């Protein structure tokens, strides 16, 4: 029985540790990206006006450092009871957040793995449920975690981990990320990044038309729109996503001539030879 517990505990520990380390690292090397994701959460709960940008940036660095450090503590069995309890608290909070995201969908991507891996809210919730169960197992039997370093050396590893992950965040903040998972990373082929593979799932929409007749406003769909009744006056339209399809890594790139309003995207991307662009926020 003890052998079964040992195997179960250490498998749960490895799953949690590797997930925390990977998740914390990919967010730590892109602190600005993590800041933007925090801003999305604050916007969803209408608190963005109360939290300044510099606070969001500090939060992004601190949260990624905590997650990465917790993963190393679990991997090396540093402070087994403490790390197990903190991981349970952390996963309880994250599971509650992703449950809210799954039900309400105020944000399409939780950002748990930065730009490295994108999961749907439902996939993230299932992932967090599995990790929550793993954390419960560790809290129940913390002493079955096998140590990799002695008690006297565990604090050396702990402090080294904190210094390492904080330095990684600072270096990535002032320079390019060590590993760049962003859509516009150096060497990216923008044209290929915008392509949709053949046979890829298409996004399906529900289009609603708002029309007015004799002071009465009514909504129509594409199926029952009064095409042959000219007495209905079109007022507005809106679209609702019924099922999300494939979205290319680069889906928001465009170049427009401000003077003429012409779209120059295709002409520039399809031009032979080199194209040099000077981009400046302030002219």
Model regions: which residues?
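Short active-site neighborhood of thiol/selenol oxidoreductases, capturing the structured segment around
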Residues: 265-283
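Solvent-exposed, well-ordered loop and adjacent helix/strand elements within mature globular domains
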Residues: 23-63
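Functionalized membrane-embedded alpha-helices
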Residues: 6-28, 56-97
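C-terminal TM-helix exit segments that contain a strictly Trp-centered aromatic cap at the helix terminus
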Residues: 22-30, 93-105, 169-175
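N-terminal "domain-start" segment that seeds a small globular fold
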Residues: 177-267
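Membrane-interface helix-boundary motifs at transmembrane edges
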Residues: 2, 76-83, 143-154
């Amino acid at each position: 029985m003890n052998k079964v517990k040992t195997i179960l505990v250490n498998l749960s520990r490895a799953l949690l540790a590797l997930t925390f380390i990977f998740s914390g690292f990919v967010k730590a090397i892109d602190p600005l990206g993590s800041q933007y994701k925090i801003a999305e959460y604050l916007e969803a709960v209408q608190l963005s006006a109360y939290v300044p940008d510099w606070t969001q940036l500090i939060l992004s660095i601190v949260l990624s450092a905590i997650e990465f450090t917790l993963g190393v503590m679990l991997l090396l069995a540093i402070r087994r009871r403490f790390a197990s309890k903190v991981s349970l608290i952390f996963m309880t909070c994250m599971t509650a957040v992703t449950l809210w995201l799954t039900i309400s969908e105020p944000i399409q991507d939780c950002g748990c793995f930065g730009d490295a891996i994108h999961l749907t809210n439902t996939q993230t919730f299932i992932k967090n449920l599995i990790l929550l169960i793993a954390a419960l197992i560790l809290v129940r039997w913390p002493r079955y975690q096998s140590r990799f370093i002695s008690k006297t050396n565990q604090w050396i590893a702990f402090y080294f981990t904190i210094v390492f992950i904080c330095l990684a965040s600072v270096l990535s903040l002032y320079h390019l990320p060590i590993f760049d998972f962003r859509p516009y990373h150096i060497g990216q082929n923008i044209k290929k990044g915008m392509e949709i593979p053949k046979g890829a799932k298409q996004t399906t929409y529900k289009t609603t038309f708002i029309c007015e007749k004799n002071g009465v406003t009514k909504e129509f769909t594409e199926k029952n729109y009064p095409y042959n009744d000219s007495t209905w006056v079109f007022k507005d339209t809106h679209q609702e996503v019924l099922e999300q399809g494939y979205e290319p890594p680069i889906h928001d790139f465009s170049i427009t001539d401000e003077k003429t309003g012409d779209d120059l995207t295709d002409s520039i991307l399809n031009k032979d030879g080199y194209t040099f662009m000077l981009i400046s926020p302030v002219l």
